[in-house]
Amino acid sequence: MTNLQDQTQQIVPFIRSLLMPTTGPASIPDDTLEKHTLRSETSTYNLTVGDTGSGLIVFFPGFPGSIVGAHYTLQSNGNYKFDQMLLTAQNLPASYNYCRLVSRSLTVRSSTLPGGVYALNGTINAVTFQGSLSELTDVSYNGLMSATANINDKIGNVLVGEGVTVLSLPTSYDLGYVRLGDPIPAIGLDPKMVATCDSSDRPRVYTITAADDYQFSSQYQPGGVTITLFSANIDAITSLSVGGELVFQTSVHGLVLGATIYLIGFDGTTVITRAVAANNGLTTGTDNLMPFNLVISTNEITQPITSIKLEIVTSKSGGQAGDQMSWSAKGSLAVTIHGGNYPGALRPVTLVAYERVATGSVVTVAGVSNFELIPNPELAKNLVTEYGRFDPGAMNYTKLILSERDRLGIKTVWPTREYTDFREYFMEVADLNSPLKIAGAFGFKDIIRAIRRIAVPVVSTLFPPAAPLAHAIGEGVDYLLGDEAQAASGTARAASGKARAASGRIRQLTLAADKGYEVVANLFQVPQNPVVDGILASPGVLRGAHNLDCVLREGATLFPVVITTVEDAMTPKALNSKMFAVIEGVREDLQPPSQRGSFIRTLSGHRVYGYAPDGVLPLETGRDYTVVPIDDVWDDSIMLSKDPIPPIVGNSGNLAIAYMDVFRPKVPIHVAMTGALNACGEIEKVSFRSTKLATAHRLGLKLAGPGAFDVNTGPNWATFIKRFPHNPRDWDRLPYLNLPYLPPNAGRQYHLAMAASEFKETPELESAVRAMEAAANVDPLFQSALSVFMWLEENGIVTDMANFALSDPNAHRMRNFLANAPQAGSKSQRAKYGTAGYGVEARGPTPEEAQREKDTRISKKMETMGIYFATPEWVALNGHRGPSPGQLKYWQNTREIPDPNEDYLDYVHAEKSRLASEEQILRAATSIYGAPGQAEPPQAFIDEVAKVYEINHGRGPNQEQMKDLLLTAMEMKHRNPRRALPKPKPKPNAPTQRPPGRLGRWIRTVSDEDLE
């Protein structure tokens, strides 16, 4: 991932390398952490076209090694003939021991002409087959297209001059490293002897019943009678072994058998011949055993193997013409392909067939393969290796993207020109902060955005080390807001006065302040500013935005912010408001992209992130803080907002910051605070009191500050501390709806009036409101107008309707719309709403429809959380509610769909149990018992480790259990008779004596005999 300070790009290197291998290798961000080096290997071949002008190139796009593919030319008899293998430029086993394939792409095209040919002819068909090479039934030029029904895995009739590109996409994840078949030190009498270490991971085994009491009978012939006992399809491009036995019985004396195994290539020719038995005489009346034990190394396999054949030659010692020969046989063989079942080794295969290319032309195969490689001991002395970085967010994002590759237009075979054009689209997919312009043009934007919302926040919540990935969620909205889009909670700011605001691209401006008239005055003083000439966004844009994430058990204080959208130099178009939370520390990963990178310093030099850099915040703080917009607050958590809120300007959040700095609460304080705290310890009043009050009430919070608030704390900081309420919230949402002393509908109207605008700010406005109410009582038409206004405000479309009115000054479009609207009793009205009147549409959906919509909403929310069994039908059967904790636990433990209306109380408090595999237990026991190369752990120690896993329900040992296991291992090692004897320790006080005769190289000591 990129640096946290980079706010424009957040690249996932792994998916970028997968989709564009030419950009270079990248470490796979899974949890297979071994020191490795990244290497990009090229493959370039110029293949000569045969006499028929047709040929076939077989690619193994996922093979983890040097083998890339093979080339075959079509003969005049209709059969293919093997030409050559396609490999990487460097022979990897010569320098490296282990390998993992990261990405691979190959391009096939022709741009050369033989003598006498003046135009490029020929076309190419390409297909990716999700099976092995031997499983293809029709490999002709046209028959290849029937190998798959997936349109993203085949292309046809591409001009040979344009070419095709083969892209390797992974079929599995979290794979281990593969041994490359590298040579190992060995000495033999034969100077040509070679010893290699081949991969034994995930072998592919073919079991062949060669004979089941097969009866053979024939007459003697000179040279013997040859039969094919069996022929079976296999696939192999790496080392293999054949094992098994056949049992022969005969009643004829003097029979002699010979057996030969043939490994046959894709073109039908014999690649390897091995004699299993020669002149093997059969004894009558008994079982004659013929064992098979063959090992074929990778070096002997010069082309892809697709079948195996066993021939039996029967002869008779001293036989004469007409002599009868007969025997019966039974037995089975097993063909083991080393590493054959490793994902990508033998399947899928991509076949590229060309036809009608001029004879003698050159077809160029060029590509790149990116690897993670572990060098051999000699190379490791001079090559630096590094661990891969575990990044669950990047890995999860890659998996989700590739799981939707058919919907996102990601193919395995491409026309080269189309693949080149898609590179910009692939860069958008790899960049989590990209605006997805090209993806939007193709209709993929919504899918990718949904994947981003699912992949990154979930991972950052489950894996705290991956929290920086939440920083990348969604798209940057700065290009929409402009450089000067800022929100304010205090004093006015005329941001358009800056020179950079005069950019021709920025033609909208969003301002937010507590003193709207001052903002207008400042804007009026900049008459030549071209910025303020339109409305950036209506409140509906913010209302329709999606939530980002939840922050659990985080201390926070809350304060409301008022946002003013200005249409022109004198008209405040709309008011909006948002609740913010103050969180300790630098937590830009929790902010929307529009706020990141912006901060203001306090008087003590610390930073408050989320504020516009406008001077200095008049506070003394002891640490850094971050302010983030929120959508909701619960008992111990807050719901973050993804709304494109610009940085804050002003001082009315100072009270919340000061409280956070002094008391440092451990959970969110359920009271909103407002007020500008000055250097003298006094709390100053702020404007837009009722709008902020309504903002707090919508979340069920009280508003605390100086003045006529829910909690009037007075203008002094000490008084504020004494009168400040405790943390618990003491009322529900929309508190005005249930007041007993109001008429039934008055509470709703009062709440809407409080949330709508600043009706109660001045006596003039209050008198105007009373005048309107009096006019409505005497004028039914005016009463209807007020009802329409309340309907627009309740549904949040006041600004939209105002914009529509500006575009339709004479109301022609509105009259046409109303004239063409379905009337009560009309055919279209009856088809949509039945025989009821026109008012049915205004009343909304029926209870049954609303219930179904609720079930669908619950199901979609569960789907975003990865709970896919909660379909709308299941939710309806479950009492129109989501899964209970017991149902979720039951599904997590058993992966079975829980029964609706069954609570599964036994699972609520039951600890999640899982079983550890024998391989996992053995690996843990080996790691604890000793380092690699030491003695293997005894079975008793393995049993002790297995007991720990059983106690921990499938999890590994904790610290105390690890100490006990280490002590047990030490005791067992001391009791082990095979352990090496300890070195004798010198006595601590005994002086060391110089051995006799070692005074020097040329000085001989004088003995007593010399003195005599």
UniProtKB/Swiss-Prot annotation:
Specific enzymatic cleavages yield mature proteins. The capsid assembly seems to be regulated by polyprotein processing. The protease VP4 cleaves itself off the polyprotein, thus releasing pre-VP2 and VP3 within the infected cell. During capsid assembly, the C-terminus of pre-VP2 is further processed by VP4, giving rise to VP2, the external capsid protein and three small peptides that all stay closely associated with the capsid. Residues 969-1012 are annotated as: Disordered. Keywords: Capsid protein, Host cytoplasm, Hydrolase, Metal-binding, Protease, Serine protease, T=13 icosahedral capsid protein, Virion. Residues 513-755 form the Peptidase S50 domain. It comes from the Viruses. A divalent metal cation binds at D30. Residues 1003-1012 are annotated as: Interaction with VP1 protein. Changing A512 to I/L/N/R/S/V: Lethal for the virus. Signal peptide: none annotated. This is Structural polyprotein. Capsid protein VP2 self assembles to form an icosahedral capsid with a T=13 symmetry, about 70 nm in diameter, and consisting of 260 VP2 trimers. The capsid encapsulates the genomic dsRNA. VP2 is also involved in attachment and entry into the host cell by interacting with host ITGA4/ITGB1. One of its GO terms (biological process) is proteolysis. PROSITE patterns: BIRNAVIRUS_VP4_PRO. The lineage of its organism: Viruses, Riboviria, Orthornavirae, Birnaviridae, Avibirnavirus. Residues 975-986 have a biased composition (Basic residues). The keyword Metal-binding applies. Changing A441 to E/Q/R: Lethal for the virus.
